[in-house]
């Protein structure tokens, strides 16, 4: 992990098109501003983790559900 020290209103660049700026600090909290192209998704780590967990759950459709759906479609087409 690269660790950088920045003061308020100082930035770092990631590639050519992502800029992260220290907007402010309050106690142990740091406020960051992020400029990035609209096609780049930006999430807090805990939100990103939750999205990944939900995607895994959604992709695990049981075979039983698929069998029931297949049966229903076959009955409909008769």
From Swiss-Prot:
Region forming the signal peptide: none
Statement: the UniProt record of this protein carries the keyword DNA damage: no
Protein keywords: Bacterial flagellum biogenesis, Cytoplasm, Repressor, RNA-binding, Translation regulation
GO biological process assignments: bacterial-type flagellum organization; mRNA catabolic process; negative regulation of translational initiation; regulation of bacterial-type flagellum assembly; regulation of carbohydrate metabolic process
Molecular functions (GO terms): mRNA 5'-UTR binding
Subcellular location: Cytoplasm
Family matches, as InterPro entries: CsrA, CsrA_sf
Assigned GO CC terms: cytosol
Function: A translational regulator that binds mRNA to regulate translation initiation and/or mRNA stability. Usually binds in the 5'-UTR at or near the Shine-Dalgarno sequence preventing ribosome-binding, thus repressing translation. Its main target seems to be the major flagellin gene, while its function is anatagonized by FliW.
Family statement drawn from the similarity comment of this UniProt entry: Belongs to the CsrA/RsmA family.
Subunit structure: Homodimer; the beta-strands of each monomer intercalate to form a hydrophobic core, while the alpha-helices form wings that extend away from the core.
PANTHER family xref list: CARBON STORAGE REGULATOR (PTHR34984:SF1)
Protein name: Translational regulator CsrA
């Amino acid at each position: 992990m690269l660790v950088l020290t920045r003061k308020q209103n100082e930035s770092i660049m990631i590639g050519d098109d992502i800029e992260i700026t220290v907007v402010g600090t309050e106690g142990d909290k740091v406020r960051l501003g992020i400029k990035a192209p609209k096609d780049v998704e930006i999430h807090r780590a805990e939100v990103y983790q939750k999205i990944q967990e939900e995607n895994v759950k959604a992709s695990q459709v049981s075979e039983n559900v698929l069998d029931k759906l297949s049966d229903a479609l076959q009955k409909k087409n008769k």
